[in-house]
UniProtKB/Swiss-Prot annotation:
Pfam families per UniProt: Ribosom_S12_S23 (PF00164)
Gene: rps12
Species per Swiss-Prot/TrEMBL record: Physcomitrium patens
Domain of life assignment: Eukaryota
Protein name: Small ribosomal subunit protein uS12c
GO molecular function: rRNA binding; structural constituent of ribosome
Family matches, as PANTHER family: 30S RIBOSOMAL PROTEIN S12 FAMILY MEMBER
Task performed by this protein: With S4 and S5 plays an important role in translational accuracy. Located at the interface of the 30S and 50S subunits.
Amino acid sequence: MPTIQQLIRNRRQPIENRTKSPALRGCPQRRGVCTRVYTVTPKKPNSALRKVARVRLTSGFEITAYIPGIGHNLQEHSVVLVRGGRVKDLPGVRYHIVRGTLDAVGVKDRQQGRSKYGVKKPK
């Protein structure tokens, strides 16, 4: 416990809240252009080829974003919408691409959890 004299000398520092998605600049989503689409392998206990894209955002940042769902149509120069949200087993991937908007089509033949993958209700 500090003395009053110590508190007068240098006051308590407020705790800074750091954002987990700095490239979005406080916006819920950002538009960007894919510069590279490739696969990466996850961290230790897991094994897969996760689809990711390098995206240049309108805020000027170059980020790595995860492409959710089975199958995608993204390639270089595709315009995508990016939201926050990390992928736990991919280090450095702190963003998700929003399916069903701009150039990213929804997941084909998706029946459940459709809203998360940009799929319309089947007739």
